C-alpha cells in the first residue's frame, strides 16, 4: 500500500479526540455499555463524532475542525452534555483520566469491530490492557514538508504535554508512583516511540515504502508513535496526552499546541536534528514518572532544569501567539496550575488520601467531568 498524498488543511486549525471511561454508578468500575451509549448518541445532532474504542467500556469523542481552543471547548461542551444525558438514562457515568484506577484488565471485552478483533488476535492480552484513555490533538499544517518540521519541533515539548495532562497514577488499585502510567502500556507495542527524523515528505515516503515492503506495516494506523503525520487530514497528531479529567483542560492543552505551532511557523526557531532524540526517551520517562516535578534536559544545550520551569518559560515565550489565536485564557490556566505543581494526577492522589476508597475517587472524577467544581 502506498502512502496517501498529504491533503490540504488550513494551517493551525485544531481537532481534538478524547477516549473516555464508561463506569457503573453502583461501584464505579468500568461497565460494558459502549454499544448502548453509541445507540443513544446517534439520535443527537452534534459536531464531530462519537465512536467505539478497543474495549466495550470505553468510547472516543472528537470535535470537528476548530480554529481556536474556545471553539474546541464549545464543541466538547455540546458533546459532553449529550454524553452525560445518555449516560444518566443507562445509570452509568462518563469519566476522564488516563487509566481507570482499579479495573482488572482480564475482565475487559474487545468491541465487536473487525479492526479491533484483528488487533486482539495480533497483540493478545496487550489489547485488553490497552483499556487506557488518551487525548489526541491534530494541528493543521501548510504542506507535507512543513508537517514533518512541525512534528519534530513538537517532539522537544513532549515532556510538557505528558506532565500537563498526566492523570493516570493508579493501575489495578495500586499507586504506580508514575503521574502518567498510561504511556507504559503504549510502549509495549512494537511500532510505538517516535517517528524517524526525516524532514521532507519524499524521504518519509521512502521510509514508509521500506516498512510496507517488510510486511510489518500496511497503513499509518499501524504506527503508534507519540506524534504521527495524518496525511488524509493534512495534520500531525499528538498522541501522548492522558485524557484530562475536565474538558476545560483538554481545550487548554489544544490551545497550547496551537500557540507552539504558531511560533514554529512564524519564527522557524530551530531546525530539528537526529541529535534532538538523544535525550528524548529520558525526558519522556521523567515526565511520565514525576510529572511537573520532572527534570528536563534541553536537547540543544544539554542543560538540566526543572521541567516546570521550562514549561513556564515556554508559556511566556508563546504568549503573544496565544493572544493572536484566542488561547490567552487557556495558557493562563495552564500557567497558574503549573506554578502550583497541580495536575490531574495530583488531584487524584489528593482525593485518594482524603477518601481512601478509589471508587469514591472515581465518583468524584465523574462529577468533575460533568462540570462540577470539586
UniProtKB/Swiss-Prot annotation:
GO terms, biological process: modified amino acid biosynthetic process
InterPro entries attached to this UniProt entry: GCL_type2/YbdK_subfam (IPR050141), GCS2 (IPR006336), Gln_synth/guanido_kin_cat_dom (IPR014746), YbdK (IPR011793)
EC number: 6.3.2.2
Reaction(s) this enzyme catalyzes, per UniProt: L-cysteine + L-glutamate + ATP = gamma-L-glutamyl-L-cysteine + ADP + phosphate + H(+)
A Pfam family: GCS2
Enzyme class: ligase
Keywords attached to this entry: ATP-binding, Ligase, Nucleotide-binding
Molecular functions (GO terms): ATP binding; glutamate-cysteine ligase activity
Functional description taken from the UniProt entry: ATP-dependent carboxylate-amine ligase which exhibits weak glutamate--cysteine ligase activity.
Record-stated family: Belongs to the glutamate--cysteine ligase type 2 family. YbdK subfamily.
HAMAP family: Glu_cys_ligase_2
Listed name of the protein: Putative glutamate--cysteine ligase 2
Phylogenetic classification of the source organism: Bacteria, Pseudomonadati, Pseudomonadota, Betaproteobacteria, Burkholderiales
Amino acid at each position: 500500500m502506498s502512502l496517501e498524498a498529504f491533503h490540504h488543511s488550513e494551517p493551525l486549525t485544531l481537532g481534538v479526540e478524547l477516549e473516555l471511561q464508561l463506569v457503573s454508578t453502583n461501584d464505579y468500575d468500568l461497565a460494558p455499555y459502549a454499544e448502548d451509549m453509541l445507540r443513544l448518541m446517534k439520535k443527537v445532532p452534534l459536531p464531530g463524532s462519537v465512536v467505539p474504542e478497543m474495549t466495550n467500556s470505553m468510547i472516543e469523542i472528537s470535535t470537528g475542525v476548530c480554529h481556536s481552543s474556545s471553539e474546541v471547548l464549545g464543541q466538547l461542551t455540546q458533546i459532553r452534555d449529550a454524553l452525560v444525558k445518555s449516560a444518566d438514562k443507562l445509570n452509568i457515568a462518563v469519566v476522564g483520566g488516563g487509566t481507570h484506577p482499579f479495573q482488572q484488565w482480564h475482565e475487559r471485552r474487545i468491541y465487536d469491530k473487525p479492526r479491533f478483533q484483528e488487533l486482539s488476535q495480533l497483540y493478545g492480552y496487550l489489547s485488553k490492557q490497552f483499556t487506557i484513555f488518551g487525548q489526541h490533538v491534530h494541528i493543521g499544517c501548510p504542506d507535507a514538508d512543513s508537517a514533518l518540521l512541525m512534528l519534530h519541533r513538537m517532539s522537544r515539548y513532549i515532556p510538557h504535554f505528558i506532565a500537563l495532562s498526566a492523570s493516570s497514577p493508579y493501575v489495578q488499585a495500586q499507586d504506580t508512583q508514575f503521574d502518567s502510567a498510561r504511556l507504559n502500556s503504549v510502549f509495549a507495542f512494537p511500532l510505538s516511540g517516535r517517528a524517524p527524523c526525516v524532514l521532507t515528505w519524499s524521504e518519509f515516503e521512502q521510509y514508509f515504502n521500506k516498512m510496507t515492503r517488510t510486511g510489518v506495516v500496511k497503513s499509518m494506523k499501524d504506527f503508534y508513535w507519540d506524534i504521527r503525520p495524518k496525511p488524509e487530514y493534512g495534520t500531525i497528531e499528538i498522541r501522548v496526552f492522558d485524557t484530562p479529567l475536565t474538558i476545560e483542560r483538554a481545550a487548554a492543552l489544544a490551545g497550547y499546541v496551537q500557540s507552539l505551532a504558531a511560533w514554529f511557523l512564524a519564527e522557524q526557531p530551530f531546525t530539528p536534528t537526529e541529535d534532538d532524540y538523544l535525550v528524548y526517551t529520558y525526558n519522556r520517562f521523567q515526565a511520565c514518572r514525576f510529572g511537573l516535578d520532572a527534570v528536563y534536559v534541553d536537547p540543544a544545550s544539554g542543560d538540566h532544569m526543572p521541567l516546570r520551569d521550562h514549561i513556564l518559560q515556554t508559556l511566556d515565550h508563546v504568549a503573544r501567539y496565544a493572544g493572536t489565536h484566542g488561547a490567552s485564557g487557556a495558557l493562563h490556566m495552564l500557567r497558574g496550575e503549573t506554578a502550583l505543581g497541580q495536575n490531574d494526577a495530583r488531584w487524584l492522589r489528593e482525593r485518594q488520601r482524603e477518601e481512601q476508597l478509589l471508587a469514591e475517587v472515581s465518583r468524584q472524577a465523574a462529577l468533575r467531568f460533568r462540570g462540577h467544581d470539586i
